[in-house]
Each structure stands twice: as C-alpha cells, then as structure tokens.
Amino acid sequence: MQAQGIRAPRTKGGITMIDVTRPELDDAITRAWQASPEGSAAAVYTPDIERVLQGLCANRFEAHYCADAAEARAYLNGKIDGKKVGIGDSETLRKLELHEALAAHNQVHNVLRSPINKGTTFFEYAKGTLLTDVFLCSVNALTEDGILVNMDGTGNRVAAALFGHEKVYYVAGVNKICPDLDHAIWRLRNIAAPRNCLRKHKATPCAKRGDRCYNCASPERICNGLLIEFKKMSNMDMEVVLVGECLGL
C-alpha cells in the first residue's frame, strides 16, 4: 500500500523517483547543498543528480530519489514490512527516525538503540546485524558516476552491508555526493572521519583539532578500513535512496 501523502514514484531507465520536475529537482539539490558545511565554501559544487542516479543504475544498484527526509522515511517504511531489520550506526538514519517507524511492524536490530542482554558483548550483538533480512546504513560518500565509498573502524557496518541479506538500503543526503573517487576519499578522511570522531568523543588528532585527517596511529582511530563498491554485490539486492537535503556527517 502506498504511504499517505507520498506521490506515486515513476520509473525511467531503471530509476525510480518521486514525481518531481527537473527544475524542482535542481532547486532542491542546490539549496540543500549550499546549506551544508561543504557547500558553504566560496566555490559551490552543485552535483548532477540525474547523472548520479543513472550512474547508480549503470552499476546495477536500484536508485530512488526522495525530496526530503519525510518522504524517504515514508518510502522505506512502506517498502520494509514484517522483516528482521538491521540498522547500522548512522546520523542520517537517526535524522529520518527510521528505528521508530520500522519497529512498529518489523523486528529491528539496531546496535545503538536495541537493548543488549546482560553478559552480551557489543561484538556478539553486532554480529546479529549480519543475519537480518534487510540491512540499512548510509554512505560516507558517493560519486557522480555511482560509486559508493565507506570507511569503518570496527568493520561491523561495512561487513553487514556486503553479504547475507535479502536487501541492503543505503540512504544518503545530497551532501555526500562528490565529483569523483579522489574527492570521495578526501571527504571520508577530512570531513566524515573528524566529525564522527568528535561525535564519539574519540581521542584522535582530527577530533581535537577538527580540521583534517592526520593519518594518526591512535588506538581510537575510526578510519581503519576503506570499502569502495564499484558495482552492486552479486546475489543480493541493493538500493540507494538519495535524499534531496543535507543529512548526516
């Protein structure tokens, strides 16, 4: 059943989008990008959303565009029903309030929100996200030609995103879009990682100074592993839900 208040998506060349016009799309993306920390720089980079969606489809991902967080929440809440759902650590998903929406009609396994039984370690509990029907997370960056890039410290998020589910959903705001792979990796190290270290109160140079990556050797470093998904993984459905506003870090 279609969620109330959401327009029926249209499909074009394998891309599904809420029924918006190109001028509406361009205006939304420009406003969202300029409102983001990256977009506040003197030279404003405006991503080509149609190229991103086409690139994702060319790389075998399903691609869906939603104008804002409310539409994205309603879309995902309508798609995922009666499933065992794993949710990775994500400021984007917190902003969408997906845990609350999905928990009403799914069994949600959230490493940050679900209660952990006494005597169960985080390692043991986090392994549970590998065994769910559906897994949701965000991306640290994605390129205009549809490549997904993530960096992880513990590895549970990227491990869960790679294998073992019926479907994985990546949810990303337009602030995560980068022109190419070099810029995407730069964003991971100099924007996403310092902000996440600061959020998690890590004792790392990037968190203390808040400006860039220092390629440190701190035991609390969170950029230990880099995952680049050039194409969709085999034997599992993967969908990228792109949201036309600034979300996450």
Task: Identify the residue ranges that each predicted region occupies.
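Short, Lys/Arg-enriched N-terminal segments with co-localized hydrophobic residues
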Residues: 3-16
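Generic N-terminal amphipathic, Lys/Arg-enriched alpha-helix
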Residues: 20-62
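Short N-terminal helix-initiation segments at or just after the protein's N-terminus
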Residues: 23-32, 110-118, 186, 246-248
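Catalytic cofactor-binding cores of redox enzymes
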Residues: 28-34, 78-80, 158, 164-165
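Flexible, glycine/proline-enriched loop segments at strand-loop-helix junctions
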Residues: 39-40, 62, 113-116, 168-175
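N-terminal active-site beta-alpha-beta segment that forms phosphate/nucleotide-binding
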Residues: 45, 49-126, 131-136
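Conserved phosphate- and dinucleotide-binding cores of soluble alpha/beta proteins
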Residues: 130-249
